[in-house]
Amino acid sequence: LAGMEAAKESGTKDLGKLVSELCGAPKDSVARRGCLLVEEALGNPAFEDLDWIVLTQKAREHGDAGVRAEAARCLGLLDPQLALPVVRQMASKDSSSRVRRAALLAALTLAPPTEEEDCSWALERFGAEESPEVRKALAVALGRHDLALIEKVAKALAVACEDSDWKVAACAAVSLGLTRCDLAPVTLSRLLQTSADWRLRGAAVVGLTKALHPDGLPPIIAALADSEPLVARTAHGYLSSLRPADAPGPDPEVWSQWWQETGSKRPLRDAKAQRERNRKYGYSTSHETIFRGMDVLVLESRGDHIQTVLERLAINHRLTSGAKVPESGLDAGGVFVSNCTGEMEPADIERLDWFVHVGGYLFGSCWALTETIQRLAPGIVGKLPTTGEVMNRVLASPCHKNSPYLEGVFGAGVQPIYSLVGSHLIEVQQPERVEVLVDSVQCAQDHGDGNLACWFQLGHGTIMDSANHFDVQGLTEATHLDKAEDRMAYAMDHMGASFALIRETAKEKFWGSNHRAAQEVFDDSVLRLLSNFVRLRR
């Protein structure tokens, strides 16, 4: 931002010089800022004559893979005619799988595989790539039904269902279903019936649910009897969505009879129903409606207690604990919330790893960053090193005002305060993969960095982390509020309480103490963040 301001005064040439110098800086954190400066300048008519390809060359040739990956991501924002050849070369030639992954996704952004030439390039990379992490990203990217060469894509994904890396195979199985080709139910039914690996059987069920093909329903019904609770619950969750008003339990015979008598006569996709879903899950929808019918599994732990928030809002959920996730079962179409401290056993993490890769959503708070998220996805985000325990209350700000995930989180004139209770602050280790949604200048000044909430994709699924606790927002931890008027002002300024609410409750006795007021006036800003992810998914 300082570079932008300086360039406005001194001219275009100075900005180009600054970008080039930053991109060539030996220190990786400095070099990445050159790419960030390009992103800030894009769209500004004053800088449209600058050759960003040339100016970022030093970043693309940098010795640090993270800088090169950031350069690749930056190229994905430029003119496709200029940037596509460069980024494709990086995707095939760079020695680092991290860089190749970033370049691949940038190339697919610039030229989606909806044209034959672009799809052929993606398929060539899918066959030639050695890194499982990059193959996994490709498998996910090919999970679309609007691609050119769709039959070739389906065949490539069918082959990848037998990949030696289970994560690649699982992602390919889900993507094969998303192609909606006739090959999908045949291949996935066979995988479900023959695989000894519960992870692949579960992925086959998810793929069949995405295929929207009547031939896929009998295998899904048969999966209700699978020995792995995760596979059976995922199958039952999908079947229940087909008859939400009167869904029976997970009895294969009952569901088979329903399918033969009634279910097979109904369409598995309905444009009118989808339009109704779009209306139903609009921004202004209540939390309870957004989560209705969705499996929400919450890890009980020693720190945070989101279940108290869910109970208050009448959101149905289940509880589990460390070492019990396998028997609890996970629905791949659902949500898992890891309360701080997020401590779990290896078998729990193994199930969650599968859950996210095939499309599940995982939300964590505070220590769950270290105890859950880092164990699932090491090296992407981690705990920021601090000199001591983080105990603070900081003003939070949105990083991207136009992000759909932040709708309703920051009301006009409202600045939430995040309560950090022994918090594990977020250190972003792979910036090209992570979007920071909420940060704090005050937190950065006090503790060295200010990332408070972020998200990233893992396989077909999503992980979101918040540095604070879900259940101690609002008046619970507020300080220096001596009078009822102080608490009302706090509720309006930091919790988004409306004038109407304040007028309606101004004479209530609960305003006399923080504890009582917190029971009546709720700060749902963090839950709104979670709800936005679920709403947009549905």
Predicted segments, located by residue:
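Core register positions within helices of long alpha-helical scaffolds
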Residues: 6-9, 37-41, 74-77, 106-109, ...
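Alpha-helix N-cap/helix-start positions at coil->helix boundaries
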Residues: 1, 28-32, 65-66, 96-98, ...
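Hydrophobic targeting/anchoring helices
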Residues: 233, 237, 248-295, 299-300, ...
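A glycine-rich, often tryptophan-bearing local segment used as a flexible ligand/cofactor-contacting loop or short
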Residues: 343-418
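Extracellular ligand-binding/catalytic regions of CAZymes and related secreted enzymes
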Residues: 272-294, 446-450, 458-538
